[in-house]
Amino acid sequence: MMQNNNELTRISIAILFITIFIATVNCSLLNFASSANAETAQQIQAKIDQKNLDIQNLEKVIKGYQIQIDDLGSQADSLSSTIKSLQLTQKKLEANISVTKDKITTKTFEIEQLGSQIDTKENNIGDDQRVIAQSFKQLNQMGNTDITQIIFGSHSVSGALNTLEELSVMQKNIFDKISSLNKDKDQLEVNKSASEKAKSDLLSLNKQLADQRKVVLSTVSQQDSLLKQTNESETSYKKLLAQKKAEQAAFQAEINNFESQLHMLMDPLKLPSAGSSVLVWPLSSVKITQYFGNTDFSNANPQIYNGKGHTGLDFRASIGTPVIAALSGTIIGSSNTDLVRGCYSYGQWLMIKHANGLSTLYGHLSLRSVSVGDKIATGQIIGYSGNTGYSTGPHLHFGVYASDGVQIKKFDTSINCKGATIPVADFKAYLNPLMYLPKQ
């Protein structure tokens, strides 16, 4: 009877080994099938690598355009240099569009690649689960065999030891399968998260592409408008600049008069402490062209600044440069003073109210990609830099305010800018942005 039990045990062990062997062969066949598709995976990776190389080459071209634009910006302001700068800007923007298209293609390939990896992992998990379930079933069937029956039912001590060793090996194989299963599950979650992020990035890139195309059209329109206004005459261009300066000064005088009468209650304790670096830079590459307060430029133009100095920071930023939110918050203001004929101020602008008592302003944009009421994340693209409003060249005006001391006002009775909407503030509400930005 013991001999029969021993034979049954050996048969069960053999069946279990065969089960694991067949499952292993199936996995090998699956891996072989995967290797048959590996060429496709390699081709996808090769395409990704090629697109990344294309992007690097285009970025070199863009850098070359930017150097030429910066050189023109350092020259005396003239119609010819302005037109040439706009033409170079258009070429740069079109190159930016090509980069974004390549990024979209690359991201699409990455999503395809991750999808294939997810399918493979799910198949592996299913196979491992079936092997483990079958193995446990076989072990349960063997569970009724007492170990003494295995030992004393064997023809020899070595036979009994071999049987026990076979059981030990089986147990290890099952544990290995469980470990492999857990690793596959972990990697599956990683791949799924990466796939979701890639899909989110793809949506952002498609929106960015649409925005960049709008900026190109805006640049072409700006160039055509300038040529019509000046009739391609340098003298007419100089007169136009002088007219803009005079009209901007007149509107600024109205603003200064209004703001001087504002006496809003502000609690300094509600504001972040200076040096806290609660904001991030609104551009990926930072070059400050005018600081906060009484700068050389503001002192040289008292008719514009009225002795209160420059109310923010100016950053060098060619037309179409992505502008990002310095901190999460809500868009509380958005307008375009250029829509009011003869009104030269911030041009296209946005204001974000943050939860820490601060509000930030982004002026002279070429395009706004968010709307009033939108919830914004730190670092999110909210628009693109430009040369709108009263601007001596493409740049970003960045202002920081105490939220309790600033309001959005529509100038319904303005002499110079009737209907224009801009932020106005108690003089004490204007804050130096460098108090809250990281050190360069």
Regions found by a protein language model. Give the residues of each.
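N-terminal secretory signal peptides that target proteins for export/translocation
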Residues: 1-9
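Sec-dependent N-terminal signal peptides of Gram-positive bacterial secreted proteins and lipoproteins
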Residues: 8-34
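Long, contiguous alpha-helical "rod/stalk" segments
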Residues: 57-137, 209, 220
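Non-transmembrane, heptad-repeat alpha-helical coiled-coil rod segments
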Residues: 67-70, 74-89, 171-239
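Heptad-repeat coiled-coil alpha-helices that serve as dimer/oligomer scaffolding interfaces
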Residues: 95, 99-116, 120, 215-260, ...
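Short coil/loop "hinge" linkers that interrupt or connect long alpha-helical coiled-coils or helical hairpins
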Residues: 112-182, 222
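Extracytoplasmic/periplasmic cell wall- or extracellular glycan-interacting regions that localize
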Residues: 228, 232-354, 358-363, 367-369, ...
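Active-site-proximal beta-strands of protease catalytic cores
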Residues: 329, 372-389
